[in-house]
């Protein structure tokens, strides 16, 4: 089965078993991500609970920056572990417990108290996610062969998106427009994270030798790596694919399409795009991840330019025009997600993957905060100005991607 998934046979039976465990556990975590999306699900829940707007506005920064910036502090710990899978297992289990805490807060509390409790649990979830992120690339690199990693992560993304599509359709139908069913979905997310931790714990990982070098040495190596610095620049420009979707929704709303304000619209666009593209992007990334980054940047820029043209023509709010633009943008976004992971795993030295991932992700966390703030400033003039800025970033990032080292050639 693993050979059919990856397109080439595993090096040994253990790699085949590990590949299937990666797909299963990663699929469960991606389902959880969709069920507890702070941009949509948690924002809706806090609105329903009567939490203040400033608390709701803190959800996305807590989740995004909290999952990236701490990684540089966690990487040294990971690289001192003989079996790095246990960091991922612990992170997934803690995310599960945090999600269950969010569901409990939504059931028992209201108003400001509910908002603060959910934000606190989300902060714990984000920190645990940072632990998973900084350890996963290292574990993937040690347990799955170089030409098969993108297929594993891509299939997980496509498989998980099926469940999220169903959830989105239920949201859009109005069947889940009550607090109770949404809390059940968040509880299910917690159980999926716990299940993923149990499955990942069975991974057959060869212990690594204990390290005796300075804890800061791997980070100094990473910071001096010109290839990594260029990658951070490219990935930093391509964060525009993650930041732009809410501004597309603003363009549609200003055009008169109230349907896009429903909770399920963005969830459906993202999940459908992930289902149709993640596995394909993953397989293409195994061949050339820098090419996928370039194509994704160009596609994102094109989608955003189309949005500007449609907005200027006054038809952005007509029918399903905006969801179609969002779908195209999310196709590009998932291409960036697949390719950035594969490039870093293939490029980083075997003994320093966690450090490389931590340096890159911490830098991206800071760039996300800065770019998000810049987008907010530009949108105060007009949402279209922010969209134009993100289109320029995506185009520049896509162009610079072709100057990256061909990680798969090595």
Feature locations, PLM:
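Cytoplasmic membrane-interface "Motif A"-like loop-to-helix N-cap segments
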Residues: 79-94, 286-300
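Substrate-agnostic recognition of the 12-TM MFS/MFS-like secondary transporter fold
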Residues: 21-40, 59-76, 91-95, 121-178, ...
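C-terminal ends and interior cores of transmembrane alpha-helices
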Residues: 93-111, 298-316
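Helix-loop boundary and gating motifs at the non-cytosolic
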Residues: 2-69, 227-266
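Alpha-helical transmembrane segments of multi-pass secondary-active solute transporters
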Residues: 56, 87, 152, 182-188, ...
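Helix-loop junctions on the cytosolic side of multi-pass membrane transporters
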Residues: 197-213, 402-410
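Helix-to-coil boundary motifs at intracellular loop junctions of multi-pass secondary transporters
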Residues: 48-49, 80-81, 139-143, 251-256, ...
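Short hydrophobic/alpha-helical segments at membrane-entry points of transmembrane helices
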Residues: 22, 114-122, 230-231, 317-326
């Amino acid at each position: 089965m693993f050979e059919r998934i990856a397109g080439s046979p595993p090096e040994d039976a253990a790699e085949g078993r590990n590949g299937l465990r990666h797909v299963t556990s990663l699929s469960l975590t991606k389902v959880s991500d969709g069920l507890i999306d702070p941009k949509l699900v948690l924002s809706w829940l806090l609105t329903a609970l009567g939490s203040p707007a400033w608390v709701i506005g803190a959800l996305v920064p807590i989740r995004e920056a909290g999952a990236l910036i701490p990684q540089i502090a966690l990487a040294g710990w990971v690289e001192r572990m003989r079996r790095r899978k246990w960091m991922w297992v612990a992170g997934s289990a803690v995310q599960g417990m945090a999600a269950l805490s969010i569901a409990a807060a939504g059931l028992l509390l209201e108003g400001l108290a509910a908002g603060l409790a959910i934000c606190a649990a989300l902060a714990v979830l984000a920190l645990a996610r940072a632990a998973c992120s900084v350890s996963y690339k290292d574990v993937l690199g040690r347990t799955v062969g170089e030409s098969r990693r993108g297929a594993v992560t891509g299939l997980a993304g496509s498989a998980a998106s099926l469940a999220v599509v169903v959830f989105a359709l239920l949201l859009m139908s109005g069947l889940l427009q009550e607090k109770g069913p949404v809390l059940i979905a968040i509880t299910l997310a917690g159980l999926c994270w716990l299940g993923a931790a149990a499955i990942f714990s069975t991974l057959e990982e060869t212990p690594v030798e204990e390290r005796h070098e300075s804890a800061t040495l791997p980070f100094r190596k990473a910071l001096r790596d010109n290839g990594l610095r260029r990658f951070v620049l490219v990935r930093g420009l391509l964060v525009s694919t993650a930041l732009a979707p809410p501004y597309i929704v603003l363009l549609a709303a200003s055009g008169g399409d109230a349907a896009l304000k429903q909770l399920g619209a963005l969830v459906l666009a993202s999940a459908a795009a992930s289902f149709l593209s993640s596995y394909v992007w993953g397989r293409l990334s195994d061949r050339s991840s820098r090419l996928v980054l370039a194509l994704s940047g160009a596609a994102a820029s094109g989608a955003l330019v189309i949005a500007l043209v449609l907005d200027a023509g006054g038809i952005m709010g007509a029918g399903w025009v905006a969801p179609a633009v969002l779908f195209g943008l999310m196709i590009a976004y998932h291409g960036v997600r697949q390719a950035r992971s594969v490039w870093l795993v293939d490029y980083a030295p075997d003994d320093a993957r966690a450090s490389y991932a931590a340096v890159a992700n911490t830098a991206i966390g800071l760039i996300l905060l800065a770019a998000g703030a810049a987008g907010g400033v530009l949108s105060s003039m007009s949402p279209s100005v922010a969209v134009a800025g993100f289109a320029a970033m995506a185009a520049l990032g896509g162009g610079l991607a072709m100057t990256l080292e061909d990680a798969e050639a090595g």
